Design a protein with these regions (language model features):
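Catalytic-loop region of hydrolases
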Residues: 2-7, 21-163, 276-279, 405
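Bacterial N-terminal signal peptides
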Residues: 8-16
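Glycine-rich nucleophile elbow surrounding the catalytic serine of serine-hydrolase chemistry
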Residues: 102, 194, 212-224
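A catalytic-pocket lid/entrance helix-loop region that shapes and gates access to the active site
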Residues: 140-151, 220-275, 322-332, 339
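Conserved acidic catalytic loop of the alpha/beta-hydrolase fold
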Residues: 175, 179-182, 193-207
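Alpha/beta-hydrolase fold active-site neighborhood
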Residues: 272-418
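Short beta-strand/loop motif that positions the catalytic acidic residue
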Residues: 417, 423-425
């Protein structure tokens, strides 16, 4: 979670005024287009805290927005904190990224970090995209792929490693698709933005404000293209390129992570980039023992570089660099524990399956093994962490048929919104 978006929210949202107005709900099939309000027990559990002052409900929408005759529905979990301020501006919602991350699980986090002046001026809406968190239905019986790191030391045959990883992920993706034939085709941003529009109508908002982080920028961008009159303001952080394909993502990730690494190493002082380079030069030839745990260059890279874009964690990353450096070059020096552990969130099996299905539903032009290997090898000369990330992203669609794509072709032209969108950290930020 980056605090940068919250500054942008303050800039982007205090623009104009939006008062609530009535809307006519779309034609409903049974309860389609309506919200069933109920207790917040499940939402509190999902959020990991009591959502005081929130109303909790479930929005019913068609599973297949392209065929409303299909009787199957999806249930979208939604919570709302209604402002009582006489200076109410409108409604604010968000998507925290992923794909596969629950908005309800991040409701308290976002609400706490948003400046009070902003939060109290809006009805605040959090929701779980279809297939995520409390929303139903969900993917079932999807194996979790577990790919090994490349060789601990020495040169890497990137094509061989990518082939191995591709086969492992393919062996998980194929049964996931087979076990979810009635759901997987209806997961993707194409459907999410239609659910989002149905939610706006059901909540009786003439317009609302959207902030999207990481993958949430894809949701916000395509929602703005499809429903420009439904948005008052749009704030995108760590934004994906609207021209993104599954293959061009490899180059974008390489550039973004390398840029983020450059920013990080330029700030903590001259000794940090020198230490970092010396660490990885040494780890190319041997592993390191830290606090009784043996780690390879890949484990160290994964720990450090996954959080490079987060300036909030710079101090902890510097501390961990010093610990690894001393373990390698000053083994007799007493180990000083970091002031706080690096918080690398684990990705659940469901989140990983959703990530693969949604990205491969959204993005065309799946990369080949040779393309992934070439991109990873090129990145490895400057950043091992970037190389690992490229392989991870590149094999997303292993095992998916080429015609699984059902989203939007790379965009051309500009968004046409009354208020210009605020886009932050679109370069040098992989998140």
């Amino acid at each position: 979670m980056k605090k940068t978006i919250l500054t942008a929210v303050a800039v982007g949202l205090i623009v104009g005024f939006t008062a609530p107005a009535a809307n006519t709900a779309p034609a409903a099939n049974n309860e389609r287009g309506t919200i069933n309000w109920h207790d917040c027990d499940a939402a509190n559990q999902e959020a990991g805290a009591t959502l005081e002052g929130y109303e909790c409900g479930t929005l019913t929408v068609p599973l297949d927005w392209d065929n409303l005759a299909n009787p199957a529905n999806a249930q979208i979990a939604v919570v709302i904190h209604r402002t009582t301020s006489p200076k109410r501006i409108g409604a604010l919602t968000f998507n925290p990224g992923g794909p596969g991350i629950s908005g309800i699980s991040r409701a308290k986090e976002y609400a706490t970090l948003i400046p009070t002046k902003i939060f109290t001026a809006f009805d605040f809406v959090a929701w779980d995209p279809r297939g995520v968190g409390l929303s139903q239905p969900q993917l079932v019986n999807c194996p979790a792929p577990s790919a090994p790191f490349p060789p601990a030391t020495g040169p890497v045959d990137w094509e061989n490693y990518v082939t191995q990883t591709y086969d492992i992920v393919s062996a998980a993706n194929k049964p996931c698709l087979d076990n979810n034939k009635d759901l997987a085709p209806y997961l993707g941003t194409y459907y999410v933005i239609r659910d989002l529009e149905a939610m706006r109508v059901a909540l009786n908002f003439k317009k609302w404000n959207f902030m999207g982080d990481s993958y949430g920028s894809r949701v916000g961008y395509w929602y703005a293209r499809e429903y420009p009159k439904s948005l008052r303001t749009l704030v995108l952080d760590g934004s994906y390129s609207p021209t993104l394909t599954a293959t061009s993502w490899l180059a974008e990730q390489s550039y973004s992570y390398s840029s983020a690494q450059t920013v990080f190493t330029s700030l903590p002082g001259t000794s940090t980039p020198w230490k970092l380079q010396r660490i990885f030069d040494a780890l190319n030839e041997r592993e390191v023992l830290v606090n009784g745990i043996t780690s390879s260059r890949w484990a160290v890279a994964a720990e450090f570089f996954s959080l490079v874009p987060y300036q909030l964690y710079y101090q902890q990353i510097v501390e961990h660099i010093n610990i690894v450096y001393d373990a390698l070059f000053n083994p007799n020096k007493p180990t000083v524990p970091p002031s706080a552990p690096i918080d690398n969130e684990e990705t659940t099996a469901n989140e990983l399956s959703i990530l693969h299905v949604v990205n491969c539903r959204d993005l065309t032009d799946y990369p080949t093994i040779k393309e992934i290997a070439a991109a990873a090898e090129a990145a490895s000369f400057t950043s091992m962490g970037t190389a690992l990330q490229i392989v991870q992203d590149g094999v997303n669609c292993a095992g998916f048929p080429d015609d699984f794509f059902h989203g939007y072709l790379p965009a051309t032209g500009q968004l046409r919104l009354k208020n210009s969108p605020v886009v932050v950290h679109s370069i040098g930020d992989p998140l």
